[in-house]
């Protein structure tokens, strides 16, 4: 059973007194994304200044396209690393009541290759499905949504297998994940009214809630035999409770 209300309630308790580092992570990721977009902003400004000068604008457009291609590759790398570092950080947060430092988040950067390949692979498949129709692209995005959690918890599993495992544990629950996303929509609107200030509370709350959903989906899939512990391989030994997690997985019980 998918109990989004329970995952959200647990998330609130897990974050009590521990918001400092998640907020710092938000500030860091926002700054990084702004920095990698600076070249695009500069090129757009130059085109605007060129006004109606056709050749200058065409030259600027060609330059902008070249910059965009390079930035896209850089963005895949950076966003992939950020995604897997986020996933690992919130898995740690979900398994211990201790306050976590920014260093816990930085440790996730060691999984940079898994993050980059995961982002590239996921984008490719979501894009291909979206070429058919928009809705299948959304459905597949939710099917692949657990991939970064799996890669963060089981770094040796491999990107392609992590995607297949994500599809397996979300089978029959993609609609639930979609509804869970919608349940935050009202808060997102309110955040817009506060010029994004509310995001400092909302984003960690969402991240923690979806991490709890991941644990539940994985535990349910193990319990029903949809997947096995061997499918995932060893858990990252540096994660809190890794030994206990391995034992529970072998028994097919909830983590």
Please name every model-derived segment.
Residues 1-255:
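Hydrophobic alpha-helical membrane segments
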